[in-house]
Amino acid sequence: MLVLSRRADESIVIQPADGVDESMTLAQLFANGPILITLLGGTGRRVKMGIKAPEQLAIRRKDVV
């Protein structure tokens, strides 16, 4: 599980991971299960979330992309 903290108006990007065949269908991308996002807590304007996703998907902070 990847754990990220985000503030109001900050984003995450979920996209095919580097090296994944671009011709893969959605069914193939999600063959190992769905994306699961769990809110783990928050303080003020910040929330901590845990994200589980198939290895074919990359999860990145938008400010890093």
Regions found by a protein language model. Give the residues of each.
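Compact, glycine-rich, soluble single-domain proteins
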Residues: M1-V65
